[in-house]
Regions:
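Conserved ATP-binding subdomain of kinase catalytic cores across diverse folds
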Residues: 127-131, 135-319, 361-366, 374, ...
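Short, contiguous strand/loop micro-motifs
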Residues: 121-123, 222-224, 327-328
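Hydrophobic residue at the +6 position relative to the catalytic HRD Asp in the kinase catalytic loop
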Residues: 354-359
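Active-site-adjacent bridging/hinge elements
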Residues: 106-113, 205-216, 307, 311, ...
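Regulatory N- and C-terminal appendages and interdomain linkers associated
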Residues: 2-173, 179, 388-606
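ATP-dependent phospho-/nucleotidyl transfer catalytic cores
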Residues: 229-230, 260-263, 267-351, 362-465
Length: 606
């Protein structure tokens, strides 16, 4: 898509003259006026030019009448302060495009020949309380002012107790392979798609409630979600976004005293828990299972219609009239999925339930259940206690990604000619090489390496092996490699600052000095200034803080007592994972995990 560069030059401001409240600038391509808030930074010396570069896509210009600050961020003055002013578009794209379940009664059943069922959320019986929200999602994606969170209509909306004009709540029908076997119809058993919102940047977001009541796809469930799993979904998706991972987003966390009974560890001991609702967003909630159920049921016309829709709206780089568009679609998903999983591996993230019904066709991370981040580096780490065989362990994620791609190929096969079907295994075979290339690209960055050399794979593999042997912390080892100077690393990490606890663990390995020598030689002749740049590169990609299970558990336990301070504080800290934050350090978030962290168990129960 074309991009336009708008350069505003020759705005002369004298510091001796009082700045006007707003500088008006005319957008040269669309003849619309936008405004820039004046600050002292905008008061330049005499004859000094102020140059501002603004980029906008062809149909995504700056919003007329909106106010922007010097960082090109839209002022809060232009946001909606009431949900009565905010609304979904009059055209509900999904509702108007696809056949909808003709049965309006809300009862569990097998559904045929549709993509969605129309069904309303079930209001909470007890008072809904908004306990946390993401301001970046609220203002940046949904154009809402923070003050709206203090209003009853907003809380009722995000709780599923009411819905707004233009909303047609839908539950999506899909299937999926769960733990390797076909499970038939699954679908949104406790989620309601409220509508599609197009924000002022031209971005399209689908808003979905999770934990909002029964649907035709609830199977044996009650349609609700408990507080502990909802806290994890809310914090997990936002933490992943700030780590630079493609992911769904979370707007809000609502809690109620509605009693929910769950057998958390499937041991025959159910207990009562609080209900919670998360409002989450994604450009699309279609997943591999969305296509699988149509292919399995031989609903080929509907399958073709759905894939064409997804290509048209989410893969615009593909010619929607091309006879080979389905192969191009599959190839793009192969590429993006390989990168997504390489990104997971690079931050020590294990999803926990990589079923095809939890795997986005847009290759974004969705459905945060029993996920976890590595503490000590253990390739066999299994975050999900329900995963008895370790199918979804950290080290097997790339392999499972390939399995899921093959299931996607099976779902697309009915749309292809015989010669095209023969291309599927060839495209699939490229997944491994793409993943390996992306993996090495990311780990080179984690080590501050520039360019690519043959010994890089050995340097990375040797480091990971030493980390496994010494049970070194995955996140903090990489972070501290970016803290210590190369000169100090070459001498002896054990002589380094005592705060470098992860490197102290690593340095106990008998091969550490040999690895440090190879790593230093790979960096070539680094002078002090170049070494500082290496460390800066590393600190920009290696987080200081991640959502460790023990941190999430502490927030959940506080929330269970009605104290949501830890949830809010964690969100604030996780928004800046690459920065040093004294308040986080005071809580021990960059320290060695406590011993009791090893005993935390997370299951599929939610």
């Amino acid at each position: 898509m074309k991009r336009y560069l708008i350069t505003v030059v020759s705005i002369l401001l004298l510091c001796s003259i009082k700045c006007c409240s707003n500088q008006k600038v005319r957008h040269q391509n669309c003849n619309k006026q936008v405004y820039f808030e004046s600050t002292d930074q905008f008061c330049l010396k005499e004859d000094e030019l102020f140059e501002l570069e603004l980029e906008a896509e062809e149909h995504n210009h700056l919003e007329p009448g909106a106010i922007y600050n010097q960082n090109k961020q839209k002022s809060l003055n232009s946001l909606f302060s009431s949900v009565s002013q905010w609304r979904f578009p009059s055209k509900h794209q999904l509702f108007e495009t696809f056949p909808i379940d003709p049965i309006k009664e809300n009862y569990v059943r097998q559904v045929q020949n549709v993509i969605f069922s129309q069904v309303l959320p079930t209001p909470l019986r007890y008072k809904a309380k908004l306990v946390a929200y993401s301001e970046d999602v609220l203002t940046g994606l949904l154009d809402l002012h923070p003050s709206v969170t203090e209003t009853e209509p907003f809380v009722a909306f995000v709780a599923g107790n009411t819905f707004l004009d233009g909303s047609i709540p839908l539950a999506h029908r899909y299937g999926g392979h769960q733990f390797g076997g076909w499970s038939g119809q699954l679908g949104d058993g406790r989620a309601h798609l409220l509508g599609e919102y197009i924000n002022r940047n031209g971005e399209r977001w689908e808003l979905q409630l999770k934990g909002s009541g029964k649907t035709p796809y609830s199977r044996r469930g009650d349609g609700r979600a408990v507080l502990r799993s909802s806290v994890r979904e809310f914090l997990g998706s936002e933490a992943m976004f700030y780590l630079g991972v493609s992911t769904s987003r979370a707007l809000s966390l609502v809690v109620s005293e509605d009693p929910i009974w769950r057998d958390q560890f499937y041991d025959g001991n159910p207990r009562q828990e609080k209900a919670a609702v998360v409002l989450r967003l994604a450009p699309s909630w279609f997943r591999i299972g969305s296509l699988e159920i149509l292919a399995k049921n031989r609903e080929i016309d509907l399958l073709r219609s759905l894939v064409d829709f997804i290509i048209k709206h989410h893969f615009k780089e593909i010619d929607s009239e091309d006879d080979d568009r389905y192969l191009a679609f599959y190839s793009e998903i192969i590429n993006k999925t390989a990168y997504m999983i390489a990104k997971w591996q690079s931050i020590g993230f294990a999803h926990g339930v990589m079923n095809t019904d939890n795997f986005s066709l847009l290759s974004i991370t969705i459905d945060y259940g029993p996920f976890g981040f590595l503490d000590a580096y253990d390739p066999q780490y299994i975050p999900n206690t329900s995963d008895d065989e370790g199918r979804y362990s950290y080290e097997k994620q790339p392999e499972v990604g390939l399995f899921n791609m093959r299931k996607l190929a099976d779902a697309l096969a009915p749309l292809l000619t015989l010669p095209q079907r023969k291309q599927l295994p060839i495209i699939t075979s490229g997944y491994v090489d793409i993943y390996k290339a992306r993996f090495m690209e990311l780990f080179r960055k984690k080590l501050g390496l520039i360019g690519a050399e043959e010994q890089d794979e050995y340097i990375v593999a040797m480091l990971l092996q030493m980390m496994e042997d010494t049970h070194s912390d995955f996140t903090t080892t990489f972070r501290q490699l970016g803290v210590i100077s190369m000169a100090m690393l070459r001498s002896s990490t054990q002589d380094a600052a005592t705060k470098l606890w992860a490197l102290t663990d690593l340095s106990r390995h008998e091969m550490f000095q040999e690895w440090a020598r190879m790593y230093a030689e790979r960096q070539e002749a680094l002078d002090e200034e170049e070494d500082l740049r290496r460390r800066a590169r590393m600190n920009a990609v290696n987080p200081n803080y991640i959502l460790r299970n023990w941190m999430a558990q502490a927030a959940i336990e506080d929330a269970g007592r009605g104290d949501f301070t830890t949830v809010k504080d964690l969100l604030k800290i996780l928004k800046r994972p690459f920065e040093n934050q004294p308040e986080a350090d005071e809580r021990g978030y960059a320290n060695r995990p406590p011993h009791w962290a090893r005993d935390i168990r997370v299951s599929c129960s939610s």
